[in-house]
Curated annotation (Swiss-Prot):
Region (Disordered): 110-146
SUPFAM superfamilies tied to this protein: P-loop containing nucleoside triphosphate hydrolases, TrpR-like
Record: residues binding ATP: G191, G193, K194, T195
Designated name of the protein: Chromosomal replication initiator protein DnaA
UniProt KW keywords: ATP-binding, Cytoplasm, DNA replication, DNA-binding, Lipid-binding, Nucleotide-binding
Gene name linked to the record: dnaA
């Protein structure tokens, strides 16, 4: 099969992004999160106009093909009328997804993704429709008000030590009062809640200021719209649309790295918004000083405001996230040990944790099976293999020894003096929290100790985390290193 031409390849990511938005609206958030969110763009046959998508398991591939094939094809054809067929198959773990670098190119003529027709904004409960008593330019901006997803609000955002600063900053920014900082720069890894906070800012800001306008877009869409406006020789409309917003939010700004003309426009847009006293929220996957191939003047401007990091969720935060999600599912009966198991084992990011929970609930509902440990380990086999490979008892021992300045042999030695015994207990505790090893297996890796010794160590650390701030701080720091 011939690979797609550069023109086709350049358009596919944006087309898939638009199709995903259509699918979310058409199928509903729950169906999208459970079945469609994990789909990846695997291949494209430019001759036969066939899109191939990949998912994690055969069960998912069969279910999607049986129940959602029409929706998939309709979504793609809405964005790209020439598509003939959409196929879903199991992802090959040894192959890479179709990674496409969207560069600043002119869009090809002819059969290509067409822009979706603009529709009047529909009023949502949490987001006002087009602002009242505004200028014509403001009314045009109102078309973008419906971009905020209601479920991404402050009430649904679970707060913990990992995201407390970012949450408080976002709340302050959304109030709309006098600002001591502008822009607000949120950074952190994938799936930790940056986009959730940005949507929450938009929803809350418009709720408090119904006559104001807010605009959220990804940096990818910023570039795509900018290139399209240059091709249409109508950059004025593009600039006016962004710079007239009272609140402008650009997500994943690292996407414009190395794209000179887009960075030029981004800088002037950012400068205009801040100078005019309007609000600007930017997000990225790393801090400003760690962003590469971004102009220094942009990085300097970003650093003027408040820079807040969103860290990986610790065990307690993950546990609270699951409990919060289950509150909205009163029909679901999930045993406590399963809740703790999910919080311990799915620690990559919040998005993966929520996806795992949705998958368990959806599969249990469809198969009419009880949610027990056998069912969960079977349903999440792919995710659990990944997390098991990430952290081993040996990894934990090495990290604990580095933290307490001990030798690795101390983890297996018979020495019982406190300077060694306490870190060894911490390592046993972390081994139980972060791996799937049984108590006897953990004991074997600590010099052949009995499982009762491991139980004693776990209980000791659990007690000390309540009464000793230093121990609790050490444990939190070590867990965060593994979960980041």
């Amino acid at each position: 099969m011939q690979p797609p031409s550069q023109d086709w390849a350049s358009l596919l990511p944006a087309a898939w992004s638009e199709a995903r938005q259509i699918l979310r609206k058409k199928c509903g958030s729950r169906t999208f999160e459970s079945w469609l969110k994990s789909l990846m763009l695997a291949d494209f046959d430019s001759q036969k106009k066939i899109i191939r998508l990949a998912c994690p398991s055969e069960f998912m591939a069969n279910w999607i093909s049986s129940h959602l094939s029409d929706e998939l094809l309709l979504a793609w054809r809405t964005v790209w009328p020439g598509i003939a067929e959409v196929k879903v198959s199991v992802r090959n773990p040894e192959s890479q997804p179709l990674l496409l670098d969207v560069t600043e190119i002119e869009l090809p003529l002819g059969d290509q993704p067409r822009p979706l027709p603009k529709k009047p904004a529909k009023k949502k409960q949490s987001v006002p429709a087009t602002p009242k008593s505004t200028s014509p330019e403001k009314k045009a901006e109102g078309e973008d008000q419906n971009q905020f997803e209601e479920r991404y609000n402050f009430d649904n955002f679970v707060v913990g030590k990992a995201n407390d600063l970012a949450y408080r900053a976002a709340c302050t920014f959304a109030e709309g009062g006098k600002l001591d900082f502008n822009p607000l720069f949120l950074y952190g890894g994938t799936g930790l809640g940056k986009t959730h906070l940005m949507h929450a800012v938009g929803i809350e800001y418009l709720k408090r200021h119904p006559n104001s306008t807010a605009l959220y877009m990804s940096a990818e869409k910023f570039m795509y719209d900018f290139v399209a406006s240059m091709r249409a020789k109508d950059t004025h409309s593009f600039k006016a649309r962004l710079r007239s917003a009272d609140l402008l939010m650009i997500d994943d700004v690292q996407f414009i790295a190395g794209k000179d003309s887009t960075q030029e426009e981004f800088f002037h847009t950012m400068n205009e918004v801040i100078t005019a006293g309007r609000r600007l929220v930017i997000s990225a996957d790393r801090s400003p000083q760690d962003l590469e191939r971004i102009e220094s003047r942009i990085l300097s401007r970003l650093s003027w405001g408040l820079v807040a990091d969103v860290n990986p969720a610790d065990f307690e935060l993950r546990l609270n996230i699951i409990l919060k999600k289950l509150e909205a599912m009163p029909q679901v009966s999930m045993p406590e040990d399963i809740v703790f198991f999910l919080a311990k084992r799915i620690c990559t990011n919040v998005r993966e944790l929520e996806g795992a929970l949705n998958r368990v609930v959806a599969y249990a509902t469809l198969s009419n099976r009880p949610i027990n440990m056998d069912f969960v380990t079977e349903t999440l086999a792919d995710l659990l293999r990944t997390t098991q490979q990430r952290v081993t008892v040996e990894d934990i021992q090495k990290r604990v020894c580095d933290h307490y300045h001990l030798k690795l042999a101390d983890m297996s030695s018979k020495r019982r003096d406190r300077v060694i015994a306490r870190p060894r207990q911490v390592a046993m505790y972390l081994s139980k929290q972060l791996t799937s090893r049984s108590l006897p297996e953990i004991g074997q890796r600590f010099g052949g100790r009995d499982h009762t010794t491991v139980i004693h160590a776990i209980r000791q650390i659990e007690k000390l985390r309540i009464t000793d701030e230093d121990v609790d701080s050490d444990v939190r720091l070590l867990m965060r290193q593994f979960e980041g």
